Amino acid sequence: MCFNQRILIGSISTEQLNKTIVIIGWIKRIKKLGEINFIIVGDKSGTIQVTCKDKEQIQQLTREDIVIVKAKLQRLDSVRFELINPTIKLFSKSKTPPLIIEDETDALEEVRLKYRYLDLRRRLMQKRLLLRHQFILAIRNWFNQQGFIEIETPTLSKSTPEGAQDFLVPARIRKDCFYALVQSPQIYKQLLMIAGVEKYFQIARVYRDEDSRKDRQPEHTQIDFEISFCNQKMIMNLVEKLFFSVFLDVFQIKIKKTFPVFKFSELFERFGSDKPDLRYGFEIKDFTSLFQDHQNQFTKLIEAKGIIGGIELTNIELSTDKIKALRKIAKDHDVSLEVHNKNNSTLKTSIKCDEKNTLLLVANKSKKKAWTALGAIRNELKYHLDIVKPNQYSFCWVVDFPLYDFDEKTNQWISNHNIFSKPKQEWIDNFESNKNEALSEQFDLVLNGFEIGSGSIRINDPIVQKRLMNSLNIDPNKFAFLLEAYQYGAPVHGGMGLGIDRLMMILNQTDNIREVIAFPKNNHGIEVHTNAPDKIDKEEVKWWIKELVK
C-alpha cells in the first residue's frame, strides 16, 4: 500500500527534486486544460498540484476522494513544487460533500457542525487544532519545569450548593443518589494542598449546565493550578511568567512581562465592566451635572436622584445602522440610549457638543444598571469602529472584588466568586455584618475584554469557612469532608483556573469559541453531528425510574 513510503506534502523539499515520491491525500480540485489535467491533492500539512495527461487515471475521480499518488517531483515555480507523470490509485471514494472544504467556505454554521469531520479537514481548522495542541504542550512543559506535578482529579463528584447548575448522573450503585460532573477541580485541589503536594496543575475538563454563548460552552477546558504557602502577588507573577514564555515560544509574540493591576471599583467606574477591553479608550463619564440647570427629558430623573452616564466619541460619527445596534444593546439591559450628534438635535439646547463628536448617554435611577449598560455598549463599539489593531494583546489584573454580591432576582446575598475565597485581612473579623463593603482575596485575569482566568487565596481556617457559609445560608454539613480536612494542618494556598478555549479564541482572532473546539455544542447546547443530548431507550428509562424510587 506504500504507507511506509509516504511523504507528507508539507515536508516536501528540494532534496526530493527529480525523484519519485509517494503522497496520500484528498482531492481538493480538478481542473482540465486541453489534454492536461491539474489535480490539487491535500493532506493535513499542505497541498500540491499533480499534473496528469492520462485521462483514464482520473475519469472516476471527484472532490474529496482519497488517492495514492506516485510521481516525479519538480519545480512549479521558484516557491512551489508539482508532481508529474503520476500513477494515481483511488483509495477511498467520497460522496459529494455538503460544504466547500476550503479555508473560505460558504456553509452555514449548523451545516459545518453537522458535518464537523468534513469542516475539520479545512486547513484553517487543522492549523487551529495544531496550535491548540502546541499551546497545551508548552503549558505542560512550563509547569513541569517549575516543579509542578500534574494530577487528574475526579470528573464524577458530589453536587454542592454553589456555582452554576450541575450536570447530574444517576448512581446505580447507591440508590436515590447522583454524581455531579465537576464544575471545577476546586475542592480536590484544595485537598491536594492539605495533602502536602504544594504545586499541582492539570489540563482539566469541567462542566456547567448553563446557556451556551459565543464565548462559553457547557463543557470546557482549563489550565488549573494551585500552590501552597503563597500570596496573591506570587500567583500573579507566576501567571505572567507562564504567558510571557508560552506566547513567545508558541506564537512568537512578545507581551509585557508584567500586567497592569486595577481595583474592581476603579474598572467599573471607568468602563462599566470588570473585564474591559483596554486596547481602546472610550471611558464612561458622569454627565449628570450638565443637565441639572436645563429643562430636558432627564429633569424628573435628576430630581429623583438619578444619574446620567455617557461615552464621548471624539471625531466619530455613527451611521443609523450602528446606532440601531447600540440601542439594541441598551434595550437588552433594560435602559434607553440617547445619541447626540450633528444629525440629532434632541439635546443641543441642553449641552454643548462638537459637531464632529458623538455622545452616547444612558440615564437611570441605578448607577449600577446605567454603567453596566454603558459597559456593554462600549464593548460593542469595537465591532463597529476601526479601533482595534490585529495581534494586539492587552492583559490586566482585577483585584479587590466584593466578597458578596446582591442578587436582585432572589433578593439575597450570594458569593461574588466562590465560597472558598478568603476575605481580605481587614474584613476577616466582621465580613458577615458588612456584606456591602467586605472585599475578598479574589483576582481575575482579563485579556482583550474577556475574563480568561479567575483565582483567589483560599480560606484555610474551618471557623472562617463555616462563618462564610452560614452568612450565605449554606449548610456547612454539605462540606463536612473539607471542613474536617482543614483541621489537620491546612497550609495557606491559592490558585487559578485559566480558560484554554477563550485564550485560543482570542489568539486565533475569531469571535466565537466554537471555532477553536474540535466538537463544540451549538447555541442551544446541542452537539449537532451526534444529536446529543438524545433520548434513551424507554426500557432503560423505566429501569432508572424503578431504581431511583426504590
UniProtKB/Swiss-Prot annotation:
GO cellular component annotations of the record: cytoplasm
Record-listed ATP binding positions: R208, D209, E210, Q217, E451, G499, I500, D501, R502
Compartments, as annotated in UniProt: Cytoplasm
EC number: 6.1.1.12
Pfam family, one: tRNA_anti-codon
Catalytic reaction equation(s): tRNA(Asp) + L-aspartate + ATP = L-aspartyl-tRNA(Asp) + AMP + diphosphate
Binding-site positions, L-aspartate: E162, R208, H417, R458
Signal peptide region: none
MF terms (GO), sorted A to Z: aspartate-tRNA ligase activity; ATP binding; nucleic acid binding
Residues covered by region (Aspartate): 186-189
Chief location category: cytoplasm
Domain of life of the organism encoding this protein: Bacteria
Cross-referenced InterPro entries: Aa-tRNA-synt_II, aa-tRNA-synth_II, aa-tRNA-synth_II/BPL/LPL, Asp-tRNA-ligase_1, Asp/Asn-tRNA-synth_IIb, AspRS_core, GAD-like_sf, NA-bd_OB-fold
Matching PROSITE patterns: AA_TRNA_LIGASE_II
Keyword set, alphabetical order: Aminoacyl-tRNA synthetase, ATP-binding, Cytoplasm, Ligase, Nucleotide-binding, Protein biosynthesis
Biological process annotations from GO: aspartyl-tRNA aminoacylation
Known function: Catalyzes the attachment of L-aspartate to tRNA(Asp) in a two-step reaction: L-aspartate is first activated by ATP to form Asp-AMP and then transferred to the acceptor end of tRNA(Asp).
Record text on subunit structure and interactions: Homodimer.
Similarity comment: Belongs to the class-II aminoacyl-tRNA synthetase family. Type 1 subfamily.
Cited PANTHER family: ASPARTATE--TRNA LIGASE, MITOCHONDRIAL, ASPARTYL/LYSYL-TRNA SYNTHETASE
NCBIfam families, per database record: aspS_bact, PRK00476.1
Name assigned to this protein: Aspartate--tRNA ligase
Gene: aspS
